[in-house]
């Protein structure tokens, strides 16, 4: 846990600086009052599948190709490329205007949530030569911030897709590409972040936006971590050079939980928050765990978070204990759980169970419902040991394990959020 806070003089007339010592003695710094990550809890949802398409969240957009006997695009890049600019713009305008509306923000607030994370791709603000992407997302983002303000919901703006892709995931916009650090791609991402910082990082949105995430899920195992660290630093300083003390959110790049304890902690860095994403469904070993083992791992996440020097929270997690959701692993890639994951034979050697009816609540018996409730409650307790949590995702078209609305409706997600049927799992 973090201990006492004391005030020191600031060279900036706009804010005070508070060095906060960790258990290990390292200090990190706070300025301004966008959000008190030290004492207040974020309880939020991601607005996934809105400005960055994901086939598993809105499969109908992609099934339209399948229904016409065409190849199914694997990501937004290929979706827009297949349709062409005009038709892609028409379909995506319809999607942007209907997937998330004011009623969603009202329902989010009504569920006791206080926060949304809004993923958006670089292409919403700047296009590369020959990019097939279409634009128009920005006006919907601006409207979303107005709705958030109306319902007292705070927001992170999350750069979810970078030029060339930072991870090769379909949710970066471009699957199976790892070109983020090649050519001008990194600079384009920095230019986009500069635009986001200039527009959304200051006082105009200071009562709504409480963080700008520099980059979602950069895949540290395939990227040059030295260059990635340079990117984070440049993005941080570009925001600070606007005069803003807005919180800077840094995803952990899938490094170990303590990897940032000695980074971004000098007086040159303040209001830095580390974003961890926690799932247990993307390897056969994780999928084979019992519910007790899932709970144990979740509680370990929480315990580790208390030992970190920086404020940190879980910016993505779900109820999933299978990878059965259609296209969760990508278009055409099947599931490890039922041994249909043909993409990687090394991860497709063991049959764990059937995916039949896995997302249909009518097939869930009481024991299964209880197990999912236990796992959700354990994660909530774990993540609230520090700054909070952001569930992935607010809603989907068809899946259950990843859908906050459906899980809440069926009583599997606690309501109120602090109610517990299985208290003390992480004590």
Swiss-Prot record:
GO molecular function terms attached to this record: glucan exo-1,3-beta-glucosidase activity
GO CC, alphabetical: cell surface; extracellular region
Active site: 217 (proton donor), 316 (nucleophile)
Subcellular location: Secreted
Disulfide bonds: 299-426, 324-355
Keyword Transferase among record annotations: no
Keywords: Cell wall biogenesis/degradation, Disulfide bond, Glycosidase, Hydrolase, Secreted, Signal, Zymogen
Signal peptide: 1-17
Enzyme Commission code(s) on record: 3.2.1.58
Broad class of enzyme this protein falls into: hydrolase
Protein known as: Glucan 1,3-beta-glucosidase 2
Originating gene: EXG2
